[in-house]
Amino acid sequence: MRIVIFIFGILLTSCFSRNGIESSSKKIKISMLVDGVLDDKSFNSSANEALLRLKKDFPENIEEVFSCAISGVYSSYVSDLDNLKRNGSDLIWLVGYMLTDASLLVSSENPKISYGIIDPIYGDDVQIPENLIAVVFRVEQGAFLAGYIAAKKSFSGKIGFIGGMKGNIVDAFRYGYESGAKYANKDIEIISEYSNSFSDVDIGRTIASKMYSKGIDVIHFAAGLAGIGVIEAAKNLGDGYYVIGADQDQSYLAPKNFITSVIKNIGDALYLITGEYIKNNNVWEGGKVVQMGLRDGVIGLPNANEFEYIKVLERKIVNKEIIVPCNQEEYEIFIKQILKL
């Protein structure tokens, strides 16, 4: 049975056990493996920037940081992680749900190395090794806010969602977004599609262009680099075609077309957890899944203060007056029981 910890505020250390691996005062090497590309202007970029911040802020504790990216199969992930181990890494971060299985294997085989993984998808019966910390995010909470804004912003009454690969995490974006939109306007029409890629800019552009041609005027995406294609489609069409980004504030890419972005600040989460590890004399207290959401400040909208009603919704979500769906089953219950549709 896995143990899930809910983090409140930045009091991160209080949530971990005192049963970690051995401490050390030596300078450490921190490595990171991401699925995809490092400079994706989104998810992976945030994680990479966090490593660079750590090196700058803890020069007396960190010998070096190293990041690498790969898009491949399970054996490729394991091989690259083995190379990072051989390079002398003390702490290795894995970024992306595709690395879920690899995280369990390498952490079990290398108990003296500390591991962290962002966005894994574990079954309820998975035992998390004591040298592994898993971090997951309540992205549906931020997507709910984005969906509410999209429904209010749309002039056509039609909005869209483009996800990358179908799965738990992308579905959380989708159903959070759709729930928020329906909460704002029960009659809003929503079309959702998947690009089946986190790296194909062209397919993102193609799907978005088709959506816009059908009268959709707001698209939220959670599709990695494929999302760049969505932005390009809106930018090329000009005024009246809007996008809502994911993971980082991407508004600088098309200021006239962006409404907001659903921030999933994995960089802050990675920085906080690693920083506590360093401050705690290199004791990595794992064996747990840590959930972070709106309450923790790592999920949200960068311009939430521009929308008065969003602050009200945030409070309702944090206080559990609104329980945001993260999958299709929960969404259907939400629609029937909460919205009476």
UniProtKB/Swiss-Prot annotation:
Residues 1-14 form the signal peptide. InterPro entries: BMP_lipoprotein, Peripla_BP_I, PnrA-like. Its main location: membrane. Changing A233T: In strain: B31. Keywords: Cell inner membrane, Cell membrane, Lipoprotein, Membrane, Palmitate, Signal, Transport. A lipid is attached at C15 (S-diacylglycerol cysteine). It is a lipid-anchor. It is found in: Cell inner membrane. The keyword Repeat does not apply. Changing V318I: In strain: B31. Belongs to the BMP lipoprotein family. Monomer. May be part of an ABC-type nucleoside uptake system involved in the purine salvage pathway. This is Basic membrane protein B. The lineage of its organism: Bacteria, Pseudomonadati, Spirochaetota, Spirochaetia, Spirochaetales.
